[in-house]
From Swiss-Prot:
Pfam families: LacI, Peripla_BP_3. PANTHER family: LACI-RELATED TRANSCRIPTIONAL REPRESSOR, RIBOSE OPERON REPRESSOR. This is Sucrose operon repressor. It comes from Pediococcus pentosaceus. Residues 5-24 bind DNA. The lineage of its organism: Bacteria, Bacillati, Bacillota, Bacilli, Lactobacillales. SUPFAM superfamilies: lambda repressor-like DNA-binding domains (SSF47413), Periplasmic binding protein-like I (SSF53822). It comes from the Bacteria. Negative regulator of scrB expression. Residues 1-57 form the HTH lacI-type domain. SMART domains: HTH_LACI (SM00354).
Amino acid sequence: MKPKLNDVAKLAGVSATTVSRVINNHGYLSSQTKEKVFAAMRELHYQPNNMARSLQGKNTRLIGVIFSDISNPFFGELVSRIEKILFAKNYKVILCNSADDPQKERDYLQMLMANQVDGIIAGAHNLGIEEYQQYGLPIISFDRYLSDNIPIVSSDNYQGGWLATQTLHQAGATNVAIFTGKSHAGSPTNGRREGYEAYLTAQQLTPHVHELPFELTPALKMMEIKTIMTQHQYDGIFCSDDLAALLVLNVAQQLSLTVPEQLRVVGYDGTALIRDYHSELTTVEQPLADISTLLVSLLLQRIEDANCTLESKYTLPVKLIKGFTA
């Protein structure tokens, strides 16, 4: 028997009115109340009745966009590009910032379903979000596996890691480290690390991997970087994102290391912010314009025809942006 709103209310221990307010994101409700309602909806596999309007073929022209941290220049620019393309096609965006919190991502996904979005672009990196596999909604993923029937768009992270390391080596570095995020299944930085390690192995050089937790504040991350750079005399450092590379350059200045004579540095992402304000940084550029265009194009194809044939993965090439740090 299909669950009803009253069933959700009973299981969550709240009124039917409260469930309705949570579904429609109306008025103030405590996070504890929202979590009880969303948990009950998940347990019962409850779909709000207003989803029927979408099932009747009436689109809402709303697209959900879920990313992990839009304060990061890379995600900020990507979301901006996605929104601009969708707006030009008469779609509006509901933006969700999951902050690398799996439960927050689940709640946002439930909210998007309740608000009858026509499709979702998912770019957070939490694992085990089974809700993506439970709904028949059009979804396109950026940079991570969600389920067998959800296409993935990404740049060539392995080639990017190889290219960055090759650039450092050809600039004269022989003791090359990588500063990267914590390794976990499905993380895009894994490919960058693998490319780094493969190049050094091919050159019979030793990899030096240092993982910097994503949740560290810039100040704490810089302290960690300074400790590492004080203990090790690296002449080349590859950072799996540009923000970490800027911290490395800051620490190098504190330690009186000249760049690129004593230390060569390569970052990763190559956003407009880096190109405009930190052109000194050599970095691997992800093709944000192409990524955003492809994400939207694939999603709209799936919205227009749920049975259209799409590839399981689309990998776009990266390129080196030459500064003077390597």
